[in-house]
Swiss-Prot record:
GO CC field: cytoplasm
Keywords, sorted A to Z: Cytoplasm, Methylation, Protein biosynthesis
Highest taxon, organism lineage: Bacteria
Compartment(s): Cytoplasm
Protein's name in the database: Peptide chain release factor 1
Family: Belongs to the prokaryotic/mitochondrial release factor family.
Native species: Vibrio atlanticus (strain LGP32) (Vibrio splendidus (strain Mel32))
Function summary: Peptide chain release factor 1 directs the termination of translation in response to the peptide chain termination codons UAG and UAA.
């Protein structure tokens, strides 16, 4: 392991011990805000500190085994070789674990997220596919014990959605879902296709972290254009007799959000404002990330929702992730929400990229 990384780890252990001491300080115990902040820092440092102490112990075990390998007794030397082998394997495993623990954490990873799905090229079939994607994500959320709340939906005439916006709440939702942003393509024979030809349709998916109230950007009332209209269902029929639906336009950025799922105009406005704030913050973060990572591959995408990330091929039962050249033949399981076999390899590739950046920096 590089000396610079060892120094960083030793500094973290020192801070861990300092925080441990502070948590027993009467002044800290009497200040709930400070106690909470230090408790959170303590829990964040605990795993990396424990792992580093195991690494140091493994190094000591290796040194002791190497000394034993110089003994005159042949049986002792043989035993020492086994211990050297075990210690080296342990050191290698712990080194990998420590490097992953040192990767800078995305502060958004623990947050809830907004999921946007929009039908793209392909007409009615794209709308049906948008419905398939929403069902897939809903099933996945159910398996994870998360809660899905529809914020806004625009139903397609033939089923599915022209647009669907949902909020997903639970543990580490954004960190799990963030790599889903991008273009999703489907290849299948539509039910209306009499010749049995395979058609290609597409949807775009955007995943944005929910912004805590304290971190919300200041949005001036003068920068907003708010329109009210009657909520409509499929085919344009009005499903509400009052103008409860809301359309908010953020004039400086041109961002538009509609919400019509609640009967109350007030609730629709609150939902639309939450999505608008998330979109504005996400757009700013994407611009900043693009400026920083022009020369580095970014699995989170360029911010261009048309970036094709995945293809779902029904005739072959195949799902392909184009970012990491991954293909699996488990389409039915994936559509039923069994997505971990798709998500884990992308996360691992992302961590490998971050480790490469960490190595360059150190």
């Amino acid at each position: 392991m590089k000396a610079s990384i060892l120094i960083k780890l030793e500094t973290l252990v020192e801070r861990y011990e300092e925080v441990q001491h502070l948590l027993g300080d009467p002044d800290v115990l009497g200040n709930q805000d400070k106690f909470r902040a230090l408790s959170k820092e303590y829990s964040q440092l605990e795993e990396v500190t424990g792992c580093f102490k195991s690494y140091q112990q493994a190094q000591e075990d290796l040194e002791a085994a190497e000394e034993m390998a110089n003994e005159d007794d042949a049986e002792m030397r043989e035993m020492a070789q086994e211990e050297i082998k075990d210690a080296k394997a342990n050191i290698e495993r712990l080194t990998d674990e420590l490097q992953i623990l040192l990767i800078p954490k995305d502060p958004n990873d623990e947050r809830n997220c907004f999921l946007e799905i929009r039908a793209g090229a392909g007409g009615d079939e794209a709308g049906i596919f948008a419905g398939n994607l929403f069902r897939m994500y809903s099933k996945f959320a159910e398996k994870k014990g998360w809660r899905v709340e529809v914020m806004s939906s625009n139903v397609s005439e033939q089923g599915g959605f022209k647009e669907m916006i949902a909020k997903i709440s639970g543990d580490a939702v954004y960190g799990t879902m963030k790599f889903e942003s991008g273009g999703h393509r489907v290849q299948r024979v539509p039910e209306t296709e009499s010749q049995g030809r395979v058609h290609t349709s597409a949807c775009t998916v955007a995943v944005m972290p929910e912004i805590p109230e304290a971190d919300l950007p200041e949005i001036k009332a003068g920068d907003l254009k708010i329109d009210t209209f009657r909520a409509s269902g499929a085919g344009g029929q009005h499903v509400n007799t009052t103008d409860s639906a809301i359309r908010i336009t953020h004039l400086p950025t041109g961002t538009v959000v509609e919400c019509q799922d609640e009967r109350s105009q007030h609730k629709n406005k609150a939902k639309a404002m939450a999505v608008l704030a998330a979109r504005i913050v996400q757009a700013e973060e994407e611009r900043r990330a693009a400026a920083i990572s022009d020369t580095r591959r970014n699995l989170l995408g360029s911010g261009d929702r048309s970036d094709r990330i995945r293809t779902y091929n029904y005739p072959q039962g195949r799902v392909s992730d184009h970012r990491i050249n991954l293909t699996i033949y488990r389409l039915n399981e994936v559509l039923e929400g069994d997505m971990q076999s798709l998500l884990d390899p992308v996360l691992q590739e992302h961590q490998a990229d971050q480790l490469a950046a960490l190595a360059e920096h150190n």
